[in-house]
């Protein structure tokens, strides 16, 4: 599990989920500190290891936060 406590005011949690020999990741993003906005997603990567899936998912989550901020 990877946790980013404060990325542009968001709390990000990422953990790997294995499926048929490949690893995807589950991402939970919530706005800090209120936590009133929560985004939950399973991101299909098909990575060979859990670590790689988590690292890729953290990058994906940070881009999601940045894109969400830009669209405001």
Residue ranges and their predicted role:
Residues 1-33:
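N-terminal segment of the canonical double-stranded RNA-binding domain
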Residues 2-6, 38, 60, 64-72:
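Intrinsically disordered, low-complexity regions
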Residues 20, 37, 55-56:
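Residue-identity detector for glutamine
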Residues 37-52:
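A short, exposed loop/beta-hairpin motif centered on an aromatic-Gly-Thr core
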Residues 48-66:
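A short, charged, amphipathic alpha-helix used as a generic interaction element across diverse proteins
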């Amino acid at each position: 599990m990877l946790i980013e406590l404060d990325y542009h005011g968001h709390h990000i949690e990422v953990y790997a989920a294995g499926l048929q020999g490949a690893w995807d990741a589950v991402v939970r993003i919530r706005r800090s500190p209120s936590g009133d906005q929560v985004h939950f997603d399973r991101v299909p990567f098909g990575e060979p290891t859990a670590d790689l899936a988590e690292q890729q998912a953290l990058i994906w989550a940070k881009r999601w936060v940045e894109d969400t901020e830009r669209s405001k």
